[in-house]
Amino acid sequence: MEDLDFPICILKMNLQCCEDFPSRVKKLLRQVKGVYAITIDPVKGLILVCGTAEPSVLIKAVAKLGQSPQLYAYEKDPATAKTRFRTLLKRYATNKTQDKPSPPAPPVTATTPVETCPAGGETFRGFGYPGPTTMMQMPAFSLPPPRGLPGWLAPPTNPRLKYEEPKVTPRKPPAPYPFDYYENLGFPPSDSLFNYFSDDNPQPCSIM
């Protein structure tokens, strides 16, 4: 990185949430246009980027993993950037010799909260387990409150109407007409000579 004549941007964030988180950050920054060199220090939580990309673009790219990094330093002049970069490396080398070994981490139990990585990893619990504060939490789903019977089984509020059968009116008996009322009487007898002597004529003429 010291051989490149480009601005240097230093971002600071937590890189020890999981083992492969630094490699994911580096892989994501390589896709940003204008980035030519990347140096990551997971212990100190520093990301050193050399290139022409703006710090806001780098912060926005890293924020896709679930954590938003802070802008620690930015030097646009390449000559001044090299000097500040060498000074920063010397200061870190001095601090590493003075650092004491940290005590071993306590064993993880059921009551000990496990630090999870926003981008996934070995310690990522999955759905239903608590995640980091910067990660979007899933809403808690619960059963709906108990209710009464559904509408088609619940008793009606208004009393039902009593069903009544329609009244059937009996037919009237026929009127007492004479027996031969519906018979065909035929045409009246014609006034002819044959009718005078016919047996069907109630008033025939008889020859004496």
Swiss-Prot record:
Lipid-substituted positions (S-farnesyl cysteine): C205
Region (Disordered): 93-116
Claim: Transmembrane is one of the keywords in the record: no
Keywords, alphabetical: Lipoprotein, Metal-binding, Methylation, Prenylation
Keyword check for Lipid metabolism: no
Annotated propeptide span(s): 206-208
Single GO term (MF): metal ion binding
Domain spans labelled HMA: 6-70
Top-rank lineage group of the source organism: Eukaryota
Residues annotated with Cysteine methyl ester modification: C205
InterPro entries: HMA_dom (IPR006121), HMA_dom_sf (IPR036163)
Function of the molecule: Probable heavy-metal-binding protein.
Family: Belongs to the HIPP family.
Protein known as: Heavy metal-associated isoprenylated plant protein 42
Taxonomic source organism: Arabidopsis thaliana
Lineage: Eukaryota, Viridiplantae, Streptophyta, Embryophyta, Tracheophyta
UniProt gene name: HIPP42
